[in-house]
Amino acid sequence: MLKVGVLVSGGGTNLQAILDAIDCGKITNAEVSLVISNNPKAYALERAKNHNIEAVCISPKQYESREEFHKTLLEKLKESGVELIVLAGFLVAIPPMIVEAYPNKIINIHPSLIPSFCGVGYYGLHVHEKALARGVRVTGATVHFVDTCLLYTSPSPRDISGSRMPSSA
């Protein structure tokens, strides 16, 4: 049985969907053995407790540095024997030290079709509210493995600050 750790920041609706899939037999080869939140008020912690799953809050606010926070997070994951990590609305960036400790074993659930509706303020229902406000006709979710690889980035070849579309060269 694969031991899964779920990291959450809020209500835990994705966590609940995973638990429901396990309860009804749709997922048969995994169990959620640990839920970690950075938010002590996250309802996801209650969802975990209701399923007799270890639920802990590890918040960056508890530590003097991000490095200490990251080390504690990694130690808890290792100590619990977690084999797969699911980021289910976890609003804290995962550092390379954790990604490297769990290569191809961290899955992120993002509530939009990436690259649309990503970044600061785009989480949970806010993503869908913003998509509806923009009149988007197709929306969805993205589930992807987390790694440290940046595929490609480049500055724009010309200044486009005054226009919505750059003219052709």
Label every model-predicted segment.
Residues 1-43:
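N-terminal Rossmann-like dinucleotide-binding module
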Residues 30, 34-58, 63-67:
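Short, surface-exposed acidic-centric catalytic microdomains
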Residues 63-65, 69-74, 91-117, 121, ...:
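Rossmann-like adenosine-cofactor binding region
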Residues 152-169:
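Single conserved hydrophobic/aromatic residue that forms the stacking wall/gate
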